[in-house]
């Protein structure tokens, strides 16, 4: 196709320009160990209040995988004492009670987790006192202790989030981990 100046361009070249711009925008944010490579752009969808069970509000973010063309939702639950729980699942599984346990089989877990961590860092930018928690859900037939997902999340979090600003607490029996802010 031709652009406004009459120059010939391809969709691929246009995509690279947008992607480069997106990366530059992320790199200007000064957060601890900000991940700006190998992740998808995300958008804020909405905030729900009065969710019960000690949850003050829930923020929903959305991103789309360019590899598998699947849409994912990231659920960030805000609790008292600046505690946030970050969860994600495929949009087409949103009504399933096992939405956190279903595997996508797209082999892009790292990129999806990095995107969720960028959502987490955007929450941290809004609230510098934020602490985070996550649970690695068990797959069908897997024990709830020390799940495969938990081990992957724990490894990525340990390499990406500094222990100088956050205390890392792990519970293998529950496959749970918290990242407590030192502020």
Segments (PLM) and residue ranges:
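Non-catalytic substrate-recognition and accessory regions of acyl/acetyltransferase enzymes
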Residues: 1-183
């Amino acid at each position: 196709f031709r652009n406004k100046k009459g120059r010939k361009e391809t969709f691929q070249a246009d995509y690279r320009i947008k992607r480069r711009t997106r990366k530059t925008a992320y790199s200007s944010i000064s957060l601890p160990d900000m991940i700006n490579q190998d992740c998808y752009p995300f958008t804020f969808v909405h905030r729900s209040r009065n969710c019960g069970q000690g949850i003050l509000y829930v923020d929903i973010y959305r991103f789309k995988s360019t590899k598998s063309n699947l849409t994912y939702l990231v659920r960030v639950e805000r609790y008292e004492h600046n505690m946030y729980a970050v969860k994600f699942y495929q949009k087409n599984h949103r009504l399933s009670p096992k939405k956190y346990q279903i595997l996508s089989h797209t082999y892009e877990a790292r990129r999806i987790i990095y995107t969720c961590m960028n959502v987490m860092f955007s929450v941290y930018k809004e609230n510098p006192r934020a602490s985070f928690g996550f649970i690695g859900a068990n797959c069908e037939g897997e024990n709830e202790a020390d799940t495969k997902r938990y081990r992957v999340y724990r490894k990525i979090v340990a390499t990406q989030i500094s222990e100088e600003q956050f205390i890392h607490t792990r519970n293998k029996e529950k496959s749970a981990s918290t990242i407590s802010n030192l502020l």
